[in-house]
Amino acid sequence: MEVNVKGNYVQVYVMLPLDAVSVNNRFEKGDELRAQLRKLVEAGVDGVMVDVWWGLVEGKGPKAYDWSAYKQLFELVQKAGLKLQAIMSFHQCGGNVGDAVNIPIPQWVRDVGTRDPDIFYTDGHGTRNIEYLTLGVDNQPLFHGRSAVQMYADYMTSFRENMKEFLDAGVIVDIEVGLGPAGEMRYPSYPQSHGWSFPGIGEFICYDKYLQADFKAAAAAVGHPEWEFPNDAGQYNDTPERTQFFRDNGTYLTEKGRFFLAWYSNNLIKHGDRILDEANKVFLGYKVQLAIKISGIHWWYKVPSHAAELTAGYYNLHDRDGYRTIARMLKRHRASINFTCAEMRDSEQSSQAMSAPEELVQQVLSAGWREGLNVACENALPRYDPTAYNTILRNARPHGINQSGPPEHKLFGFTYLRLSNQLVEGQNYVNFKTFVDRMHANLPRDPYVDPMAPLPRSGPEISIEMILQAAKPKLQPFPFQEHTDLPVGPTGGMGGQAEGPTCGMGGQVKGPTGGMGGQAEDPTSGMGGELPATM
């Protein structure tokens, strides 16, 4: 029976602390981390996830890479017998409420921004966001002769060359490619550092000169050179109904509105496609999986305009699937989706935010599965209680355990936010160990489960028109059981979720979505809907 049940095994990873490598690019916490990894091994965890910060490794100058601290960290992980998910973190960590560390993008890159501030994403007020370079400079050779995409490709190439021993040994199994703020493929539409607070709709962030020029050219090409960016979409903390653009039957449904939203979201998809193509060339032939992070923007999901998703770049409506288009692009690169909110229940949310994390998770996971992708998830808040774990288990195997083989749909893996002493002590540790057992279908840890094949070359380039065919018709998600059939103990209680957001795809505070590598969720997400004044 065990052979048949083995197909139900879902791998479990744990995000390492943000300061696993210090802000001065040193590995200084070896003894502490060694003890924590020992506890993870005892719990049966399959591996760990770590941010590999661009701002640390290439901080001293163009191509002046220093991988020494990360090599020491990776050696420790290897000796523990754990696998490793490495995040190419091209974004800033820090600068928001709850951030434990501050790691900006390289100073020499920011220096280019003092001469040309349009290298940064810019809102309609002219405020620059220095977390991540605008996709408008993807192909602009502004950085000592290199474009942004070339810098990212060179960084990944240097990583491959310096970490070859860990790639060859099968220690590194996942390369998660950062594509935006918090490492997520999105625009920085809801920055707390610029005054956004949950559940604001956010703003369109495309006012740098490079994206403005691109839009003007695109509008002229369809015979509307007079079209400009929306001027009725409100401000960061508006609700949809306070704006002409997002209200019911608003501007977003007009020809001009649809054109803008398509341009805005298509640019994001093309940005991901460009960088994943480079990542594929870099890691071609290695036994790794490429992955990207998609942000879990669950607030205003229940209103027709899906306003907060639209400002982030996800063109998702009741009759248009904004996530399957992304999945269609990823299919070309055989890349996986990493999504968040896996522990959240609608019943835990504020009614005023019109939030629906369960429906959102089901839509995104279904989109990935329909495109034949491996799909992974994270929790958004560091929760330790059976209620959260059981929600994750339900999402991991929507139809429950299949006694006769692999389920039709299941997560490829789950990454827990985040490693801390609080996780590996007392009842929290007991609950976590039980959770890992349940994710493994009560089977022993298997380091050889889901073996990686050599990464093949990306498929032929797909036109944006072909990608957009995935948007319609918008199909219903696959059915999900209400409860897991393999629960962790008694349910009830919130059991210790974090108050307020913490850090991004390994490091930024970004409110309500969780990060690929580890930020926490907005405090209203799973805390009964209270909106603290600090937000």
Swiss-Prot record:
What EC identifiers does the entry list?
A: 3.2.1.2
Query: What residue spans carry the region label Disordered?
Result: 513-535
- sequence repeat extents: 489-499, 500-510, 511-521, 522-532
Q: In which tissues is it expressed?
A: Endosperm.
Q: Which reaction does it catalyse?
A: Hydrolysis of (1->4)-alpha-D-glucosidic linkages in polysaccharides so as to remove successive maltose units from the non-reducing ends of the chains
Annotated family = Belongs to the glycosyl hydrolase 14 family.
- Kindly give any further remark recorded in the entry: The three alleles show different thermostabilities and different affinities for soluble starch.
Name the record gives this protein:
Beta-amylase
What organism does the record attribute this protein to?
A: Hordeum vulgare subsp. spontaneum (Wild barley)
Name the gene that codes for it. BMY1
